[in-house]
Amino acid sequence: MGTIAMASINTTSTSGGSAAPIQMSGKANAATPKLNSEVEMGSLPGDAQTQEDDIMQVARVGDVPAMEKLFESGEYDATYHDDEGITPLHWAAINNQYAMCKFLIEHGAEINRKGGESIATPLQWAAQRCHYYTVNLLLQHGADPLVTDAQGYNTLHISTFNGNVLLLVLLLHQGIPVDVIDTFGHTALMWAAYKGFPQCVDLFLRWGASVHATDEQGFTALHWALVKGSPGCILKLIEYGADRFAKTQTGKTPSVTAKELNTEVAWHRALTECGFDEDGHPAVPPWPGASYFLKDKRSFVTRFLFFWPFVLVWAMLVAMSSAPVYIGVPLGIAAVYAIQWVAQQVLEYAPSDMRHFHKTPWLTGIFAATLFWTGVNWLTTVLFATTLGAPEGKGHGILNFLFALFFGFTVYFYIASMRYDPGFVPKMNGIAEQKAVIDELLAQWKYDETNFCVTCMIQTPLRSKHCRRCQRCVAKHDHHCPWVYNCVGINNHRHFFFYLISLTMGIVSYDFLLYYYFDTVSKNASETCNVLSPTLCKYINADSYTSILAIWITMQLLWVTMLLFTQFIQVARAMTTYENMFGIRDGTNITALTSTGAPLDPNHPSLSATGPAAAHSHKHKGGMLKSLSRTLGVDPFIETITGRGAVSGKNKRKKKNPYSKGCITNCKDFWCDPAPIFGQRENGSAVLGGERVDYSAMYESPSLMTITGRRDRGGYEAVGTEDVV
């Protein structure tokens, strides 16, 4: 299947399997600047010609005064070009010399002049190196992004070769047709799929790119994705309805293509995750009524995996309490395994983004089930035994009242944390508004992955973060909690905190109730059993079901208290969990820019990365224990108590928390916020340093606002009841 490679289609232009575009010229091959001070090193002037006399070299280094002198001498002007048609604007563009480009344009440079071996424009030279600030400058002054080079590639195609999503977003907002083709009928989507850039594929598909478009040989984007074998690209194309049986002009389907190119593993995996068998046909569950239940897969799987744990928890408790310990424990484990196996079978037919338990409401259902069966046990067993059924003078009405109160609070705040909008940052109303935001960020030199979300197409406020589970940016994002199946953000953070407090107090009060309950019911119980001490034997023999339930709910106290402790410390420090783990973003680290405009910060990788994690600044590594540690909140707890957090220890001296106003003020801001406790707050509203702020529209840190004295859209302000931040 060697002919499948895109290089073979364009044999006159490319060689091998890279299918990379021809470089702008032999000189351009050496242009790999990382900073503005690095210049194109090809064909430097010889001894007979000084740097000041070589207009091309002056353009490379961006020496505007020297260029002015050359123009004043009358030897050159901005329209000068060499024998290959290359102009000073070409060299300034490929080396990201923004000031030089602006100077040349203002002095009459031909902005769409073609030159070099590939006969390309300055815009294409700049796009080849992902210099999107220079690209934007050229576009503002009339550069045509649809002009093609010698190979038939326009600026969108050339930009796709490098996979820089920010540059592609900029170009798409210029009105370039997303399905524009090159000489051989390849769309940008095909190139992104072939190069293995899942983020670019996702961007083009969300922009409306056709998954059914074919090139001259009948290849679709899905065929090209199978050449590279990128699972992310293949999966995304199938999700958007790519034809799994489309044939090329030679009759080859994607399945045949995958087999001949040894990418069957990625192909079959993508098919499975999208609900198809290995032949590409819809997978049909063997259980009765499956076609009815799976009409709406997402709704059915979500509801099933929330309520099925109710059966799991009940079966575990009954199994373990119905037999001696050496039989009950294995029986309980077997029951849990069997019930989870059923859930796993349902999960096989879930949408592709719900194929793992931690991406579903499974853990939420386990907690809800524990809460439900605890309430049932209290109402049917413990309540009467510790009030009306207790010996005279040994009733515990007050303790029962306290438990009922904490139980009710836990239920309410649990539901509030789960159902309330966590603080999703509002999206733009259309492409025009998105373009206005992009233009504003470019004007402020803030167009980068730190300040712009390519998924939501919005300017990201400070302290916000894009949640890959919720697929939205969340204002003052704390963390995504699998136990409430929701993000914890500015809108529901306090509800989540009250949920933890109520849960902790509820478990403690119930344990006290159970102590008095067993003291009453176990007086005549046998002390004989296996393994356990006589006291525990009496409790289990008196009421084994309640005993197992007590052990189960008390175990929850471990992770709850760790999480509660961490949250108390973070509130006192005016930090979120994300900031505690990965550092504080205050909007001041984006002044130093690389040639692409990305921040000079190792914690913020370029969006040209090909992996799914390219848009966020850290990688999640580790096996099952690490995953369990994150799920139970152990990681932030350890980071907090050991002082190894991102804003503690060695990093403490590097950056002060601009959001902290002192422990007392921080706590007052959080706890005395006028937003309703029993109800939903206005989206993004909060208190910071005693002033009302809107975290869904905060773009500069308070410390920077204090220095500059600005109180506009780029920061925060105290507002009245009719004012909007």
Swiss-Prot record:
ANK repeats lie at residues 84-113, 118-147, 151-180, 184-213, 217-246. The chain crosses the membrane at residues 304-324, 327-347, 365-385, 398-418, 496-516, 548-568. It catalyses: L-cysteinyl-[protein] + hexadecanoyl-CoA = S-hexadecanoyl-L-cysteinyl-[protein] + CoA. It is a multi-pass membrane protein. It comes from the Eukaryota. PROSITE patterns: ANK_REP_REGION, ANK_REPEAT, DHHC. InterPro entries: Ankyrin_rpt, Ankyrin_rpt-contain_sf, Palmitoyltrfase_DHHC. The keyword Manganese does not apply. Residues 325-326, 386-397, 517-547 are lumenal. The DHHC domain is required for palmitoyltransferase activity. Belongs to the DHHC palmitoyltransferase family. AKR/ZDHHC17 subfamily. This is Palmitoyltransferase AKR1. It comes from Gibberella zeae (strain ATCC MYA-4620 / CBS 123657 / FGSC 9075 / NRRL 31084 / PH-1) (Wheat head blight fungus).
